[in-house]
Amino acid sequence: MVTLPSAIPPILGHVVVTPRQFPTSLGRSSRLDSVTKIALAIAGSEASGGAGAQTDLKTFHQLGVFGCTSLTCIVSFDPHNDWGHRFVPVDPQVIHDQIEAAVAVHGRVDAVKIGMLGTPTTIGVVAEALESYQFPRVILDPVLICKGQEPGAALDTDNALREKLLPRADVITPCLLYTSDAADE
């Protein structure tokens, strides 16, 4: 699997940015300098911290990139039931509002990294945002289905991902299974 750290620096390194004010949790304003890049992770949340938006933010931080998120779903695990997964999608309007807020607060987003979306409706909302905001760089790390989702939904999700997001991606970082699937092998 191609990892995000190897993909992001060259992509973000070619974007010219300007300083912007943004609010902090203390109600003060902080200033991002003109060289700090901003990346938006559109992804699911996963409690272990080993995947999803949490890991994207850690990766951005390690690369010196300021990260913000739009959560698409919440995935939980049941340690008492063979670590079974529970998938809960975030309301599409909330996803839209999160993306809109990230852009409005920072005035720009230099790159978008898309992870687990989980439903065709969510994919549609993200595709609309990509069209509306014309983000300079789009990294797609497709997660077609997780344990706990209905297997029948995987085909609709896969088709929506191929149709609406794959053509808009500058970089795709799938695992081998998804690479074979995307290549129709």
PLM ranges: what are they?
Residues 178-183:
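Conserved small/polar residues in nucleotide/adenosyl-binding loops
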Residues 32-41, 53, 57-151:
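Conserved N-terminal subdomain of the carbohydrate kinase-like
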Residues 2, 7, 15-17:
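Acidic, Ala/Val/Gly-enriched low-complexity intrinsically disordered segments
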Residues 170:
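Receiver (REC) domain switch/active-site residues of two-component response regulators
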Residues 154-161:
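Charged helix-capping and loop-helix junction motifs
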Residues 43-49:
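Short, glycine-rich nucleotide/cofactor-binding loops
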Residues 165-166:
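A conserved, positively charged/aromatic
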